[in-house]
Amino acid sequence: MMTAPSDTEGYTGGQGDSPDSPDRNRQRNLVDDHNHNQGQDDGYSQGHVTGTGLHPLHQSQGRYPRASSRRASAAPLNYDVPDDYAHLEASNISPVQNPDEDPITRLDTLERVRTRDRDYLREQRRKPLPPPQEPESSAEDYEREKQAGVVAKRQKVSRLATELYTISYLIFFSLLGTLARLGLQALTSAYPQSPIIFPSIWPNFAGCVVMGFLAEDRMLFRPDWGQQQPNPKKDDDDDEEAKDIDPAAAKKAHMALKKTIPLYVGLATGFCGSFTSFSSFIRDIYLALSNDLAAHGSSAAPVSRNGGYSFMALLAVTITTISLSLSGLFAGAHLAIAIATLFTRFDLGLPYTFVSRILDRLIVLLGFGCWLGAVLLSIWPPDRHSAQPEKERWRGTATFALVFAPLGCLTRFYASAHLNGRLPSFPLGTFVVNMLGTAVLGMAWDLNHVPSLGGVVGCQVLQGVADGFCGCLTTVSTWVSELAALRRRHAYVYGGASVGGGLALMVVVMGSLRWTEGFGEVKCIS
């Protein structure tokens, strides 16, 4: 039977500054624990994780073993992240768990990872950390690394600063993701004779490609990211130790490491989650069911058809979107594997000094400053015409969406952090925000399509809520990554509940207007 290594395997370091600190003493033996527990069914035991008192995110801030000929140094990635970050949308499960195509591999699932995280948190509430072990050996290792010139300077980042950086990245990348989604929709749905007539498909595909690349990539945020380069004279002495490192465990360690970096959280949760939109996907399913999809974005009236054709249209939108999104996720992961050598050869990884000392501080101004700029552009739009207010399009097309986008992204971020770990086999946080965003989009759509109701400004605000808040509150990139990481039965249950629940909400919300008064013309969209 294939066994799955724990996501804590491969960590061999600590966060404390002292070589004799408890964290350093416990973390240095985790790789040996992996070899001892390798034959277990899920690679997890009381002595393997909870016995050491270590959390995957806490370990990721320690020393990271490199599957190469050079020794790992003490990583200075001392972001003080909350334990809830273990349940973020950015999963610990890589889309491609066997990149080398080995004949026998050990697979892990999302249920196992989140069960371990949940059990750790419960264990920490019941008992304190165990006493340190082998302090003499830990001190010797620390001194040997110090003499070898591989101990990096540590820079402690407080929890308040870490959360501030994370929120700022989320705000900034939610704005970029919203602009990318709206721009790609305009590019792919405006030309004649388009083979795909529903606008949500291409942003969802493109966002999943980026998500797959970020999840699989190990070069942008390298395993030794933020560490000083070791002394090359000591490389030969470290060959034997490097051979003992399990590449699968090291890969899982790197996945957990990335989730502690605010920039990575901003890219995966902020940009990819805002680039894709689950609520727009469900809206297009309902429009296909109600025979309004062909007329969406055009003045041509739909041709009447029977219910059987509407059911076929519903299946077409559903299957096409899910298939392309999953394909995009794996295509992005394959792209990351393919260009890994190129990144290594030309040293194209993100420089740690620039990110930690400059970009982390600059993003606070950029994030909140750009959000404020979107508010000001909504108050004074660039295309304002005093004599012809009906020609103002910027607010309905983009600026109001940018105002509401960070609110949806931050809501999704905290919902996933607090809810995703409650049911390991069913990501509750992602499900809740997808259902909530779908319902809100349905209400905004109804209010915008009620005949003879409201004016241009009210229409623009509702359009901004639909494109900005609902578009960033719901996500397809995270959803398909969870489908790929869950066990087969749980994936079908979770996927079916998400699509079925979202469509049921749209039938109730949008159907109540569609099958009574009918959809009217939108006043603020040309």
Swiss-Prot record:
It comes from the Eukaryota. The chain crosses the membrane at residues 160-180, 195-215, 261-281, 311-331, 362-382, 399-419, 425-445, 453-473, 493-513. It is a multi-pass membrane protein. Residues 21-36, 103-123 have a biased composition (Basic and acidic residues). Signal peptide: none annotated. GO terms for molecular function: fluoride transmembrane transporter activity. Keywords: Cell membrane, Membrane, Transmembrane, Transmembrane helix. Its main location: membrane. It is found in: Cell membrane. It catalyses: fluoride(in) = fluoride(out). Residues 1-73, 90-149, 223-242 are annotated as: Disordered. It holds the Pfam family CRCB. Belongs to the fluoride channel Fluc/FEX (TC 1.A.43) family. Fluoride channel required for the rapid expulsion of cytoplasmic fluoride. PANTHER family: FLUORIDE EXPORT PROTEIN 1-RELATED. This is Fluoride export protein 1. It comes from Neurospora crassa (strain ATCC 24698 / 74-OR23-1A / CBS 708.71 / DSM 1257 / FGSC 987). The gene is fex-1.
